[in-house]
Amino acid sequence: MNARTLMIQGTGSDVGKSLIVAGLARAFTRRGLRVRPFKPQNMSNNAAVTAEGGEIGRAQALQARAAGVAPSVHMNPVLLKPQSETGAQVVVQGRRVGTARAREYQGWKPRLMACVLDSFGRLRAEADLVLVEGAGSASEVNLRAGDIANMGFARASGTPVVLLGDIDRGGVIASLVGTRAVLDPEDAAMVRGFLVNRFRGDPDLFADGMALIAARTGWPALGLIPHFPEAARLPAEDVLGLRGAERPGGRVVAVPVLPRIANFDDLDPLRAEPGVSVVLVAPGRPLPAEADLVLLPGSKTTIPDLIAFREQGWDIDLKAHVRRGGRVLGLCGGYQMLGTRIADPHGIEGELPEIEGLGLLDVATVMTPDKRLAPAEGVSLPDATPFRGYEMHLGETRGPDAARPLLRLADGRPDGAVSPDGLVCGTYVHGLFADDRQRALWLGRLGAAPSGASYEAGLDSTLDALADHLERHVDLDRLHALAAG
């Protein structure tokens, strides 16, 4: 028997769709239902590795965690990873299939809809309830032809829609009523009701607003959801949600915000540490001289981001930081930047065949067409502290400093490199700081006392609190009844 299905669409980006689906997934799972999250099309450079060796949006991985199941490539069958202002890498059912510019991508959509519906059918066959997340805004009617992310998917799959608005940014009445006004009648008929998210203050003061929206749209109000401040403890997928955590007196970890920063959830466990101040360095600002650690994050396009890094003068700041005895850690693309050169003989990242690196590690990288996607575990060196994380990268890095690897993987492969003085390190492994043992090790190197709290347990505690929050403010029985079976 196929599962019931319900789709949460939004009036815009960053209105809380991912968070609400995660909370609903945990709430319905606690009621004994087999829940699966699903997002037909996602656009993000913050990806997660699945057990199948594929990649999906990080939000769907969190939603899978909320549902108590392993992430699957079928939870996000189309993932777009932006490489420029107009083009993106296209990942289908976990595998990279090519790159496309925005106009070119429109022609791909009919073929991609078949993949989307295939993955959706697979999830329905193993679940009691599939919770679907839309993308961006439901009101982008200029993109409606061939749509696979919002109403196009809802209509093709027969999935009812609940529309989510965000009152915190202002204009929620206009955004919900305006969405109703621009939808064609068949699309509007898919909407079964609306939710208003991130309300602050006395809910009685917005009762007239909820009634007005219902009257103007013909959609019933399904809940007014108060602001949930604990959401800041959960990983953000969109770069709009990238957050620092500056604390006076804490050990300073400085992170340059690269144009195509990727997998920035590596920062979240550090943000959660009370003895650490995570400083996001925006373009136009220097790397802070007081930094204890400069962390070069992952990048979707290493060579263009390295060029941008130099344009900001951060290369000069970084070398001054090392001369002062400061530590540097490069993760994935950040690791590649730290070497002496990066070669791109296949033109994977553009037309530049080679670029000089920052020269802080005596290693060189060659970009290769094959992407490594896999969970990773092993020990760090020389202390033999265990770790769990994941690999998600193009390219191979070799050189004298790689003879001092930072990690040794369970299959015996060395990973990463360490400079002769031990101050500069690089690794291809993401997720190190989410491992409590590795986070404690690195905090010790910085002279900070770890909190001792389990990061993973903290995620589950926050998901439970989110589910409790939705139980109080949304009629979940009614939502379940609205889902199509």
UniProtKB/Swiss-Prot annotation:
Gene3D superfamilies: 3.40.50.880, P-loop containing nucleotide triphosphate hydrolases. GO terms for biological process: cobalamin biosynthetic process. The keyword Transmembrane does not apply. Disulfide bonds: none annotated. GO terms for molecular function: ABC-type vitamin B12 transporter activity; catalytic activity. Pathway: Cofactor biosynthesis; adenosylcobalamin biosynthesis. Belongs to the CobB/CobQ family. CobQ subfamily. HAMAP family: CobQ. PANTHER family: COBYRIC ACID SYNTHASE, DETHIOBIOTIN SYNTHETASE. This is Cobyric acid synthase. It comes from Methylobacterium sp. (strain 4-46). The lineage of its organism: Bacteria, Pseudomonadati, Pseudomonadota, Alphaproteobacteria, Hyphomicrobiales. The gene is cobQ.
